[in-house]
Amino acid sequence: MDGGSLRASPAAMDGGALEPAQQLSSLEGWTGQDRLLIPRWREARSLSWMQSPDLESSKCLTQGCCYPQAWILACSAALLQALASSDLQGSLDRVNYSRGLGPRVRLFVFPDTVGSTRKSGSTGNICSVMLNVATGCVRIEK
């Protein structure tokens, strides 16, 4: 992470429109690069990732039809490792695997050391995840 990540606009967090070039029609058969799957802001505040194809751009924010409730953000394995080992935010609380139809998704739940906003079905508190829609950068905050 370059440290220059910014908060996304409220419209983007609420599911505002994306540029056509950033839209994905399908997530089926994805392999290769790691990408972040970030649920929409008001529905969930957790960070996860899934296997996805190499779309050339390593910072492309998209919305997929298979996961209409989530943003999909391209990232590198190095970024995932940095998030997991971040001393500022603490270590990951747990890793879950989704079940059922569709691609397998790893769900990373970050502990929230400040508040006590517990999500239903979660074994730990979670912190906020901010996006920069323009650059595709991710910023995790308490």
Curated annotation (Swiss-Prot):
Record protein name field: Putative uncharacterized protein encoded by LINC00479
Gene coding for it: LINC00479
